[in-house]
Amino acid sequence: MLLQSCGRRACRLPRALRRQAPLGNLGDRACLSCTSLRLANKMTVHFKYCTSVAPVYAYSKKDHYCCWTKGLERTYFTLMSSSGSWTPLAAMGVLGPKYLPVRWWHSSRSLQDDSIVEKSLKSLKDKNKKLEEGGPVYSPTEVEVVKKSIGQRIVDELKHYYHGFRLLWIDTKIAARMLWRILHGNTLSRRERRQFLRICADLFRLVPFLVFLVVPFMEFLLPVALKLFPNMLPSTFETKSKKEERLKKQLRVKLELAKFLQDTIEEMALKNKAAKGNVTKDFSTFFQKIRETGERPSNEEILRFSKLFEDELTLDNLTRPQLVALCKLLELQSIGTNNFLRFQLTMRLRTIKADDKMIAEEGVDSLTVKELQAACRARGMRALGVTEERLREQLKQWLDLHLNQEIPTSLLILSRAMYLPDTLSPADQLKTTLQTLPESVAKEAQVKVAEVEGEKVDNKARLEATLQEEAAIRKENEEKEMERITEAAEKAKETLQVAAMKLESAVDLEPAVLQVKESQVAMDSKQELAKADMETLKDTAPVLEGIKGEEITKEEIDMLSDACNKLQEQKKSLTKEKEELEELKGDIQEYNEDLQEIKELSKAGQEEVVEESKASKRLTKRVNRMIGQIDKIINELETNQKTVDVKLDRGDSPPAGENLISIAELINAMKQIQKIPEEKLTRIAEALDENKDGKIDIDNVVKVVELIDKEDVDIGTSQVAEIMALLQKEEKLEEKEKAKEKQDKEAAEVKN
């Protein structure tokens, strides 16, 4: 069970406490929301942090009734209260074990969006399916090609090369700057990495011969780069064996480089020989209709082009008022930086997407009224004062738009945030929502639609999209810098206040005592300042200290990452590297299968109209060669580890799990890196222990840390636990989907 902050309408709180409620710190009070857990009874449960309850032994006082109901596949917790006010924790009486894991399976797709090849395959399959079913298919209007004069063609060609060379120069500058940051050990944010990936794909597309120059040059200079720039990898890679240290560094860098090159391959658009080049023009006309002329496009146009405004693209370009409105609608914290608001919205949208798949599998009719209300409320739809038939109808409409029509969740939520009348059709609601999107979203979507259809993208459009994203990155970095300056100013102000208080108290002392006091302060200045700081916070704002302790800063996330690397080094474990290598091989296999399927579906007679670019083919060969080198390094490291293990004493029993560590081990490792209060270390470690058995999987912790590190946000311990659970559930769903795909392929082979 995960604690979530409650909305303003959910409770009546004192003003001071209400301000802190969105941050997830309610003192003696907390709200356990069952919106995302989809419990049987949608009542507000009043607990403090993690509640100690167990089946049969749970009881309560003051007209509360609670019980556990265990079904075939679910475990429900039901609580009914006759009191609308908040009840302190003392009102609950609980016996039994300290924690009870309630495992209700939320699953969603991984954070990465579909690649260009996967989107092209989906678009092609969707067209063929609609043609077979006889449904409406969007077909662009046939425009008579006007033959241009020689002078006009020369001007167009000159403009094309001008924008192409300008794009090449700007891409080279940005790539060099980001590469320099990577070499100096700086981590790229999610937005910067996406920009770097797109730029590398553009460079290889503009100059395919770069594959023969850049990639071998990078591989050859890897040992030199590791010597010249030791900060590329954390200090935890330093071991007693120089050879082992060198091999591990090479393994890590080669693996990251291979993964990045494979992502670059998937980012490169395919070439469609049959493409007429009208898609970009059609999209511009469509957006001009809904933004300027007021003309209503067809339903097929609206549904087709709405798919392009993906969650990541939409959220990254929304203004702050729009982000705040979405957070309030979804009952999320609406205070914080834009980056933080986007992060928590992304996590919530993934949860909603997972729930949609589960509800579609079970059927809307199987949900109770309470579950229907919870599901509709979580999606920003009316849940109170609505009949049961209306609840089922609007939820079915949502599932049809989201899962069948593949409309992004962010657009659907935005349409609900605008409180449009229910009489509007879904297409009209989407049209009105698209009108509110910033102009910057349209430019990126225009490039995306051409890439998906396999058409040639104009260099000018690519250049505008690149400059626009670069401006957004600069603005984001400025916000982070302002936030750091503000935090530093607040800390300096607090230190000055503490020093002023000490001087005021010292004035009243006698001269002799004053000298002793001054020497004592000089000797223990750091400890005294920390103590006085804590006492000051307790005296003036008791709630703020709780918030301070619950928040995990960026520095503490880095410290947690270093601690995990040290523990992995102690266990001599290469599990993470093996998993990443297998995942990379799976990505390559999936890419090749998708590519082959696209060629078969788009084949015109005996001629293949879709083909890879030259740069993509050359990069694929390089990645396959690097995978062979990575396999050799892993085998060499494993051979060395086996040799060392034979020399060790065999009397000690092996650990219960290769990657499992105790909470105490993680806390001790974090203590060695940075001085953090014991209580906070314990809370961080317990947040990572999902099933509360005292054991933590290091690899799962590393995945959570990498996700948070890319976003560069400060989050609470409860959110860390939520992310931990979400990533584990995504892995389970991915395995389930792979098994289903395998069965479908086997069934298709049997039919053929």
From Swiss-Prot:
Q: Where is this protein localized, as stated in its record?
A: Mitochondrion inner membrane
Stretches assigned to the Mitochondrial matrix side: 227-752
Where the record annotates domain Letm1 RBD, the positions are 249-518
Q: Name one Pfam family in it.
A: LETM1_RBD
Keyword list (alphabetical) reads: Antiport, Calcium, Calcium transport, Coiled coil, Ion transport, Membrane, Metal-binding, Mitochondrion, Mitochondrion inner membrane, Potassium, Potassium transport, Transit peptide, Transmembrane, Transmembrane helix, Transport
Q: What is its main location?
A: mitochondrion
Ranges in the Mitochondrial intermembrane compartment?
113-205
GO BP term (any one): mitochondrial calcium ion transmembrane transport
**Catalyses which reaction(s):** Ca(2+)(in) + 2 H(+)(out) = Ca(2+)(out) + 2 H(+)(in); K(+)(in) + H(+)(out) = K(+)(out) + H(+)(in)
- What residue ranges carry the coiled-coil annotation? 443-509, 550-639, 720-752
Which residues are the transit peptide here?
A: 1-112
State the similarity comment.
Belongs to the LETM1 family.
Q: Can you say what this protein is called?
A: Mitochondrial proton/calcium exchanger protein
What lineage is on file?
A: Eukaryota, Metazoa, Chordata, Craniata, Vertebrata
